[in-house]
């Protein structure tokens, strides 16, 4: 499957894509406007969601069709934007995540535990790849702001 982990500053995902007993690497994070979308699950449904999100119209009927045409547990979307973290559930509705970090996918529990112990989303996904054969390195990372600006802001400079 996949591992996606996010905090309020960055989002990370493994790049392993599995098809039966084969695997290859592909991006799972997509920057669209001020949002970064992380996709997990059925590849066709995930890419259909990304295209829907890129559309200036974002027709809600098209979104419902994307989710209806697939098993509700086969598409997981995490959105990181300046307002926080959203999880698009299997019904196609975004849920705001109130915690400081979030993880989803087959390695999601391992990534959550790693972040509870202070690891970054990138480190958490890398740790999850060691425990989950369906997730694999390299890890893709996207920041809302350039990392240098984020670190300066944290130090109060």
What are these regions (language model features)?
Residues 126-155:
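Charged phosphate-binding loop/patch that engages nucleotide di/tri-phosphates or the phosphate backbone
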Residues 1-75, 80-83, 91-123, 146-152:
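Conserved short S/T/G-enriched processing/targeting/catalytic segments and their helical context
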């Amino acid at each position: 499957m996949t591992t996606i982990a996010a905090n309020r500053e960055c989002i990370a995902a493994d790049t392993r894509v599995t098809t039966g007993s084969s695997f290859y690497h592909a991006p799972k994070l997509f920057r669209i406007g001020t949002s970064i979308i992380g996709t997990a699950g059925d590849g066709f449904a995930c890419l259909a969601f990304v295209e829907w999100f890129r559309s200036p119209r974002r027709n809600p009927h098209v979104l419902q069709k994307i989710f209806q045409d697939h098993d509700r547990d086969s598409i997981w979307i995490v959105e990181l934007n300046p307002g926080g973290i959203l999880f698009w559930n299997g019904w196609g509705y975004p849920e705001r995540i109130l915690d400081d970090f979030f993880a989803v996918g087959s390695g999601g529990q391992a990534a959550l535990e790693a972040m509870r112990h202070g690891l970054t989303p990138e480190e958490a996904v890398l740790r999850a790849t060691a425990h989950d054969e369906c997730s694999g390195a390299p890890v893709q990372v996207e920041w809302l702001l350039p990392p240098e600006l984020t670190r300066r802001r944290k130090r109060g400079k």
